[in-house]
Amino acid sequence: MAELKSSKLDAENARNEYNLFKSSLAQIGTIIVQNVIMLGFGMSLAIPTVVIGSLMSDDGVVDDGGDTMTLTETEASWYGSVLLVCHPTGGLLSGVLQEIVGRKWCMALVSLPQLVGWYVLWRAGNAFDLYVSCVALGLSMGLSEAPVLTYVGETVEPRLRGPLSSVSTFTIMLGSFVAYLMSTVMPWRTVAMINMAVPVVSFAAVVLLTPESPVWLLSRNRPAEAKKSLAYLRGCASTADVEDEFSELSIYAGFNKSVDLEQYVDCGIDQRRLSYVKYLQINTNDTTNAEIDILANQSQTGFLDTLKSFWTPELNRPFFFIMLFFFFWSFATFIPAKPYLIAVFSEIGLPCTAQWTLVYTSILTLVGTLLNVLTVAKLGKRPITLVSMALCAFSMLGIGIYMVSTTYFSFSSTWIPMILLNALFFFSGYGVFPIPWMLVSEIYPTKGRGIASGLTAALAFLMTFILTKSFLEMQEWFTLPGLFIVYGSITLIGTLYLYACMPETENKTLQDIEHFFIGDLDDYEDCNNLS
């Protein structure tokens, strides 16, 4: 499929009045601060693996530092998956909440259920308490994802959007690694107690150091505050310095009521809408309000209007694309096995203990995610995704074939599955786990972006919940080697799907990406020189 090409030069060429370095530093600093939230996300995602590994083994019970709690296989399957089924509820709630209270305060409110979840886990006395803690942690995970991704898409320049949108995935992996590492030297209750500090720090960081999204402020008819927020995000520049970018942002968001649209056609403005506006200006006596009526319409839409907009190509085409991506993502990352990784590693037969393999593979995932941050702007999302998906598929197929060979052909070499596992976790962190979340911040238009991103995150984790809850049953049906082969085969099919349907969005404006998904290829080729 032909790739997108940006319809304009880098944003800095049009805004040479203020310092580019300060602008970059302000955006990077803001995104790093808000991503303290995602550190708690990663710890929440990892804690079921730690607890299940401590409280359940093949004979049913493992004593963890004198802890008398136990988990049956059924309780473990529910505990490992209830986190993921509560995530969609939080995701749907965040889609509505961030439109009401704003991106900033939606991110700040994440800390409340997360703090409750860690406290309940610390004081847990039975399986029900574990479920309650996962409900709270799952809600906090769902509440955090959509506003963080939406905020990046609305505040970061195209030249930085790719690397900074992958920072959240890196922070998630960092949180998981820290949780795994702590679990090797202390009981899981102590891990939960220490983790209670994370939501407190993240709440303070977001409230004190993060400005509200300019796009959301525009949608609430607060242009003066929006301009100040944009100026802060561009290196504490003056509002006069960001006037040009503010006008472009206002037009794209559909809230500008005064500027001449024709000068922005080459920047990605829909030419059909421009023509209609000019038609109304010529054929009505009210030449000033015609533009206002058309462009201000988006800011007056309600919740039901936003839901109706899902029937439009601007929303439903990227929605169906990204949901299929997430379906294959669930298999390629091997995330349904995450709560049971200690048992999986033990069955494969590796040269080191399962607990330290967990730490080691989390380091590889973390390194892969960091490499993504450093290379995505140069290499692009599409080639990174295709190569990583293919290598994850071959790694899982290789592990499955190896395990079959040890059963039927008496062949064994523990370093072969170790190398394949290393490849699986490294490339899942490099080009599979972060990419769809990066796309969520880019592919949706302003109208409905908050709800669409929340719904996407919710359904993605609902799929993951179903696969996680059924993992042990599927393992009984297919055996673990067969399950690796099934996962690898589905990932290979997903690679072919993405090869056919995934556009390149790196260094492209949001207008360019929107044109791609509405299928306006004629205008697209004229504006972007598609090859």
Language-model features and meaning:
Residues 223, 231-238:
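TPR/TPR-like (Sel1-like) alpha-helical repeat modules
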Residues 2-225, 258-531:
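Transmembrane-helix signature of 12-pass secondary carriers
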Residues 238-244:
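Boundary/linker segments of alpha-helical solenoid repeat arrays
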